Amino acid sequence: MSQIHTLTMPKWGLSMTEGRVDAWLKQEGDEINKGDEVLDVETDKISSSVEAPFSGVLRRQVAKPDETLPVGALLAVVVEGEAEESEIDAVVQRFQAEFVAEGGADQAQGPAPQKAEVGGRLLRWFELGGEGGTPLVLVHGFGGDLNNWLFNHPALAAERRVIALDLPGHGESAKALQRGDLDELSETVLALLDHLDIAKAHLAGHSMGGAVSLNVAGLAPQRVASLSLIASAGLGEAINGQYLQGFVAAANRNALKPQMVQLFADPALVTRQMLEDMLKFKRLEGVDEALRQLALAIADGDRQRHDLRSVLGQHPALVVWGGKDAIIPASHARKGPEAEVLVLPEAGHMVQMEAAEQVNQQMLAFLRKH
């Protein structure tokens, strides 16, 4: 029995409304497996590959290179089994007619981020998913925000409630820090759990967010069900201190770009808009001081200040790293006590973005067990 699938323009992040087709990676007639990269798409924020959520044969490339299409628009038709061209024509025609009829300003916008006073400061967070299972909290890294999880959040929320937050000093949360240390950030995560009436949660942290997650588990072990640590700080001594210093000091695009490209194995992922957005953030009142405080709290030159490996043995843990990480070496993945470890050789420090499908599948499997 044949099945005709439609591949559509994904929505990456809260603000994405459209994407431009950059290049097709698979051609008509090619066999596609679930998780394969089918085409490259560029948005005003980032460039990435669209992965197939199903298997089959790519029968029709509907979108053309350089074509800009709204979120949800038809990109391609993939067929499992056999299908006549007339059947594919009918699917395309029906999709296009219904998509035009349902689009426009009246279309539902979906969930939006929330803001509230939490632990004495304004905090922004974004929730997806239902009430089934223990909730998961996503904690971003130094200089990031909740959008660092834009390729992961929807997939992870298919099986549980998932909350991504902006840490103090970041995103749209309050910028002023008091002590500017790991405990202050960790206390904010615990305050958010209290605010949301979550007694116990899985924590997933990237980079500095991994150290925050480990520290939360050390401060309040009864509140943490498991740890998913993505290119995490706190698992070894070495760190690229020049990156931290360069990122903090960068005041224009030319100074910022050499720092940002170190985050990715593929420097082409650093778009002009990504740089502009980061510069806008860095120019907000209070951001410079917050980043300087946190950089000092994280590292002394090329040496991390916090060794949190002892916490690993107290909770189920998944450790994920990109083999081409230029910020924190992937060798740290195997330095801690017993934990599940996944090293993706072709990814960099932003491994959860560069290898989203592999990271998502590993995390989903890990979370189901715990």
UniProtKB/Swiss-Prot annotation:
Keywords: Acetoin catabolism, Acyltransferase, Lipoyl, Transferase
UniProt EC number: 2.3.1.12
Start and end residues of each AB hydrolase-1 domain: 135-355
Enzyme class: transferase
Alphabetical list of InterPro entries matching this protein: 2-oxoA_DH_lipoyl-BS, AB_hydrolase_1, AB_hydrolase_fold, AB_hydrolase_sf, Biotin_lipoyl, Single_hybrid_motif
Cofactor(s) listed: (R)-lipoate
One cellular component term from this protein's GO annotations in UniProt: membrane
Pathway recorded for this protein: Ketone degradation; acetoin degradation
Coiled coil: none
Reactions that this protein is recorded to catalyse: N(6)-[(R)-dihydrolipoyl]-L-lysyl-[protein] + acetyl-CoA = N(6)-[(R)-S(8)-acetyldihydrolipoyl]-L-lysyl-[protein] + CoA
Domain called Lipoyl-binding: residue spans: 4-79
Modified residues (N6-lipoyllysine): 45
Any Gene Ontology biological process: acetoin catabolic process
Gene Ontology molecular function: any one: dihydrolipoyllysine-residue acetyltransferase activity
Cofactor detail note: Binds 1 lipoyl cofactor covalently.
NCBIfam families in alphabetical order: PRK14875.1
The protein, known as: Dihydrolipoyllysine-residue acetyltransferase component of acetoin cleaving system
Organism of this sequence: Pseudomonas putida
Record gene name: acoC
